[in-house]
Amino acid sequence: VIKSGGKTRRAAKMVILNVDHPDVVDFIDCKSKEEKKAWALIDAGYDGSFTGEAYGSVFFQNSNNSVRVTDEFMDAVVRDRVWHTRSVTTSAIAETHRARDLWHSIAESAWLCGDPGLQYDTTVNSWHTSPNSGRINASNPCSEYMFLDDSACNLASLNLRKFQDATNELDIASFKAAVQVTILAQEIVVDFAKYPTERIGANSHLFRPLGLGYANLGALLMARGLPYDSDAGRAYAAAITSLMCGEAYAHSARIARDSTGPCEGWAANRDPFLGVLEKHRRQCDLIDAAYVPYNLMQAAKQSWDDSIKLGRDHGIRNSQVTVLAPTGTIGFMMDCDTTGVEPDIA
């Protein structure tokens, strides 16, 4: 049994199965079946706490399970078509299912026990900054970091409430400065970190992926009087996220310009990398500006314009720069009222 730091937080892992795998039906409901067993044990009087006997007696409790779906599968769901699972080694058809039956099973199991999650393979790879070096097949345990196999990402998060001024507006200058300082610090950490395998270490230095994110979004929205589930809340969150990501890429390009040059993986991926930055810029224009302060919206657009121009001229030092981690542990050490991007939990 592995317990992180000797405490009750168990080591995490992500388990992913492609939606065309022959075992996908069993995989979809494996955790929900174990959840029902735990309920029965709790009803029989066993301890149902996180570290209690009930959940300690059932399987699959130390992993996050996700089904990897493609646009082809999602189209089959929408059009109510059949879906074939295929042999991994020969690609021969193994079984045929109604796509919507698989979809409903995924939804029911996720509703019952939280798993499986979904990873949208086609979308993930369409936003891949380094596709010429390999495709993205998987993620880290919490699914915020997706990149090449055998790679690693050091994470950092900012408490958004600390950047609100007396009128609950975002202090844009301070936020951008924090992004710049943190990206530089994370870039330095890449060379000082220890890696579990030689291959992970090599890729981390070739591509230098970083994971800057934020926490306390739910509290930020409450302080502004914005419902979490609202167009206004989503637009405001999108603008902040866009500003953070755009400024992080822009500063990564400044580091490449002023210090050490782009990462080694840049040369082979320059065109698709710049294409992803341009996609981000176009998405920024789609944020509903009616719900976002003008200066925040303009700052986000300017950061993306800067990242594209600097990237074209000098390259980018880091193949990825932002993630949105759940911050389930560090969020409370950071004086957050809510964790990650989540609302206040009842």
Residues covered by each model-derived region:
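Active-site cavity-forming subdomains of large catalytic enzyme subunits
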Residues: 1-177, 191-203, 248-291, 297-299, ...
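Short, surface-exposed loop/turn segments at secondary-structure junctions
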Residues: 197-204, 227-235
